[in-house]
A protein has these predicted regions:
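Flexible, active-site-adjacent loop/turn segments at secondary-structure boundaries
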Residues: 1, 97, 108, 153, ...
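ABC ATPase nucleotide-binding domains
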Residues: 1-106
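Surface-exposed loop/turn and secondary-structure junction residues enriched for glycine/proline
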Residues: 11-14, 41, 48, 63, ...
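Small-residue-enriched segments and motifs
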Residues: 51, 105, 119, 166-171
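A short hydrophobic/aromatic micro-motif that marks alpha-helical segments and, especially, helix-coil
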Residues: 57, 85, 118, 191-192
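C-terminal boundary and immediately downstream tail of ABC-type ATPase nucleotide-binding domains
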Residues: 99-122, 149
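Non-catalytic connector elements of ABC transporters
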Residues: 114-116, 125-228
């Protein structure tokens, strides 16, 4: 190694990470704790080190506990996940279940969901008082549900006969790197109600004829039912 004669402080961030992992593995541990292992690195170096780390840990026979706020990092490297909210751990679940049915708002936020609203169960639907909407969920809604989550990419431009379609006013449009983010106010929403975030391909947004008033829809199965 070209840096074998340097002190730890003289190493770059990536070299320090590699050195730390080598020291850990040299002690032949039965478990490894990785606490935000890439938090101080730029995106390219993080990508390179993540690939190296995943390959190295692939041959590790013990348990790895990976602490992270990065949902992509968790999704790529972990099989099971446990959300900690205000010092309390929630039940351990699979990655698929976390993204499909997070169960709580804390878990939904960690999974990347951007839209939330108070909810009142209505058999197989929910009433959202802040937005003045009743949305079908396509399955029975438990009595304990008090919030719902909607992922930004599940808010869609409504086609003919779309279920859960409603009219909105576009309040703000934000051009992201590869997509367009539109912040919407549903008709009948309370003045202080949170805006609804929709994210779509740039080409799809450019093709919208009326960019001020839109009709959007949310698939029933895409509504996340959340308890406190």
């Amino acid at each position: 190694l070209e840096w074998k004669d340097k002190s730890y402080r003289e190493l770059s961030g990536g070299q320090q990470q590699r050195c730390a992992l080598a020291r850990i593995l040299a002690s032949e541990p039965t478990a490894i704790l990785l606490d935000e292992p890439f938090s101080a690195l730029d995106s390219y170096l993080k990508y390179q080190l993540e690939l190296e780390l995943a390959e190295t840990l692939g041959g590790f026979p013990g348990t790895v506990l990976w602490v992270s706020h990065d949902r992509g990092e968790v999704f790529r490297n972990c099989r099971r996940v446990c959300v900690i909210d205000r010092g309390r751990s929630q039940p351990v679940t699979t990655l698929g279940e976390l993204f499909r049915s997070p169960g709580t708002e804390a878990a939904a936020r960690l999974s990347g969901c951007k839209n939330y609203a108070d909810a009142r169960p209505r058999e197989d639907a929910v009433f959202l008082p802040d937005w003045g909407l009743t949305l079908s969920c396509g399955r029975p809604v438990p009595e304990g549900v008090c919030r719902i989550g909607i992922r930004a990419h599940h808010v869609q431009l409504a086609g003919p006969g779309a279920e859960n379609a409603f009219s909105c006013t576009a309040v703000k449009v934000v051009e992201d790197v590869f997509s367009t983010i539109v912040l919407l106010r549903p008709e009948g929403a309370a003045p202080e109600a949170p805006l609804l975030r929709m994210e779509l391909d740039k080409d799809n947004w450019q093709a919208v004829p009326d960019k001020d008033r839109l009709t959007v829809s949310v698939p029933p199965e895409a509504i996340l039912l959340l308890e406190s």
